[in-house]
Amino acid sequence: MPKLKTRKAAAKRFRPTGSGKKIIRRKAFKNHLLEHKSSEQKHRRLSNLALVHEADEKNVRLMLPYM
């Protein structure tokens, strides 16, 4: 059976947790247009990593076959 290809865009955006059972992602809305956003929103709400929702996890795992 041939090797499976990894979707490189997904590989840059997602990584597994320490146990490997769940997938971590970065939160959105923190790239540009930050002047009008409050520092609370930027620092407290958007700085932490988030888990990929279980409904989307299957699709992410299909894009990353060796994760």
Curated annotation (Swiss-Prot):
Organism placement in taxonomy: Bacteria, Bacillati, Cyanobacteriota, Cyanophyceae, Synechococcales
Family according to the record: Belongs to the bacterial ribosomal protein bL35 family.
Recorded GO CC terms: cytosolic large ribosomal subunit
Isomerase listed as a keyword: no
Keyword line: Ribonucleoprotein, Ribosomal protein
NCBIfam families: rpmI_bact
Gene Ontology MF terms: structural constituent of ribosome
Origin species: Synechocystis sp. (strain ATCC 27184 / PCC 6803 / Kazusa)
InterPro entries for this protein: Ribosomal_bL35, Ribosomal_bL35-like, Ribosomal_bL35_CS, Ribosomal_bL35_sf
Protein name, UniProt field: Large ribosomal subunit protein bL35
Alphabetical GO biological process terms: translation
